[in-house]
Amino acid sequence: MQRDYLIRVETESMPDFKRLNGLMIGFVIKGEAHIYDENNMTQCNSGDIFIINHRDLYRFQLQQDGIICYIQFQMKYLADKFDDAHCLYFHLTDATTTKNIHQLRNIMARLVSTHIRHNELSKLTEQQLVIQLLMHMIHYVPRTYHSNQSILNDDKVNQVCDYIELHFHEDLSLSELSEYVGWSESHLSKKFTESLGVGFQHFLNTTRIEHAKLDLTYTDETITDIALQNGFSSAASFARTFKHFTHQTPKQYRGDRPAITENQQSAQHNYHDRELILLLNDYIEEMNHFIEDIEKMNYKEIAFKPTNQQLNQFNHIIQVGYLRNLLNTQYQSQLLTCHHDFQVNEVLAYDVMPYIMKKLNAPFTYDAEISNIFYDIDLCLDFLLDHNFSLTMHLNQYDSRDYIDAFKVFIHHVALHVSHRKDLKFNLYVTTLHNALIEMIDYFKALFPNGGLYIHLDQATERHLPLLKRLEPHIDHFVFDANSNDAVDFNKMNDDEFKTASQMIINKTNYFIDLIHRHNLKRPLILLNWNTLTGDTFITNGEYFRGGIIIEQLLKLSSKVEGIGYWLNYDLHVSHCKNERDYMNSIELFHQYNGKRPVYFTALLFNKLTSNILYSDDTCIVTGTDSNFQILLYDAKHFNPYLALDNQMNMRATEMIHLNINALEEGMYKIKHFTLDKENGALFNLWRKHHTIHGMDKDSIDYVNRMSFPKLEVYDIDITDTLALNIKMITNGIHLIEVKRYPSS
């Protein structure tokens, strides 16, 4: 309603000071304007925004051809929208980002333009934009709460003023309000005059008259109706009071402003509506949303302090199943992409000895002069050597004589094949322990002295301590698995189980650290097969976005494990699983058609962090130096993944984080802001939208892969001391902000 807020375009100066009841925000459309308060003058040029807060004294002076527009919110309207509105004080500072200034101006330009056009849907659009403007101010404009502003030196007088401004239309008396604040009438009257320079009744009548002016200007209601709805007992009483304050009768005041309609009131002076709309169009940009769906506000103040903490990056181990899969050019491309994006340099392949034993025991004999039984293996080794990948091979059921003989033939051939080239980093991985491993590892180490032995740990490991002790000199790493889904019955809604599941990976890690320390077998750990909560089906695994949960686990593990394992892609992973539950034991980086899953981008963003930790808390870590640092913020909510499938119990929530980085060196900084959440980088959202009963064609595949990336925003900002960031965090989302100061010129 027009009485809730005013939308104005001004082309003439305002000669006298007024005290504002409510909140005003505007900007200079053209030319130059001087905005005055009690103590200062602010010069505003085209595009500059100004804010006038509740009870501020203000006036403006427009220079030649100057035009300003503003939206003035009445205090009663603001009080209906949020608590303590009368205490809210907005202030634009150097820390208010250019992006947020643009967005505020964009909303206001749209709002004023819509107001001027006055078409069929103007009212509805106008109200949407008004709410958007308020929401944007609340979320992105720095503010404080002034419970006692400078013009009032007494809290109780402040309370009385607030009460009058919200209840001016009611029958108010000094007696009633003195009882409201617990003072005598004489004491309240004295304090009121001391604080405001006018008496109680004068302030009450001024407030009522200002609201009555709005009704006279913007409504066709009768004088009597206007009098009664603004707190006057009769039309005669209203007319007397109105003339005392304005030197006009209500009828004369309305007559001086004939037929001012809402679309006409903005086109003052020499400007027509079309000219104003053209000027406003220069400030209008595309907007993604009308309404911000923020459910929670969070404030972080960060100042960097010296710390001895270090963040360790992981050695990533990629499982490819059978070694021959390395001959697939698509898989090769995926490995090279991982190597480029987050330094993947180790491949884990299944045991090749059954394949070699089959060839060695074939019913015909291979002629070494015209054939090579290791031909395809050599091609795989060449790919690894060409791109500096190390090879880790899983040895399985190796306790037979035939197996050991085949193993020696294979190892001897590999040693010969790589002898003329740079060394291949070669590791062996065993999940079961047999005495035959002693003979095999001795032979292996003779040919590959830098080769490693990986031993899998589980609850049965302690039964093999004597053998472990004998192998200890050769052991490089211990390997273990941890799957959070094992801790939960997904058919139940037991919060305790989900709380336990959230700690499953770190608790299992600590268990094995304690185990190897107790037996003096200290070696680095590799977490090979692992997963966070996903549910126990393919559907929940895709629909339940968990980027923040994964990054939370990586941060907790970075000081405890050296290596992290992934499957390369969905097809390889699922082809080596017995059932859906088995599939949930591990995570893959790629889906089909080279689509990158969010875990891929999680690893990529984690890899952008540097080792020196400047700050950390439960949902944030900052690494780097004070002039070149990375801010990682994340949300990690562990809940039943099946709730992600229920539209009636949608667990998506949005939090606005106001982050201030203080005490930065003055200068120009470059900001790169990556956002990974269910709206930015979640592959399955787009996949399902573009998948038909016949699958996906090339255009759909290319589009989905092109769009399934984290959002990236890049901009420069001039910082004097504080970097202020406003971050919209969706459930289990991740934000990485890279901040780098440009060298001084």
Curated annotation (Swiss-Prot):
Record-annotated DNA-binding residue ranges: 175-196, 223-246
Keywords from the named record: DNA-binding, Repeat, Transcription, Transcription regulation
Signal peptide: none
SUPFAM superfamilies: (Trans)glycosidases, Glycosyl hydrolase domain, Homeodomain-like, Regulatory protein AraC
Transcription regulation listed as a keyword: yes
GO molecular function, one term: DNA-binding transcription factor activity
Chain ranges of the HTH araC/xylS-type domain: 158-256
InterPro entries: Glycoside_hydrolase_SF, Homeodomain-like_sf, HTH-like, HTH_AraC, Tscrpt_reg_AraC-type_HTH
Pfam families, per the entry: HTH_18
Protein name: Uncharacterized HTH-type transcriptional regulator SAS0078
Organism: Staphylococcus aureus (strain MSSA476)
Lineage: Bacteria, Bacillati, Bacillota, Bacilli, Bacillales
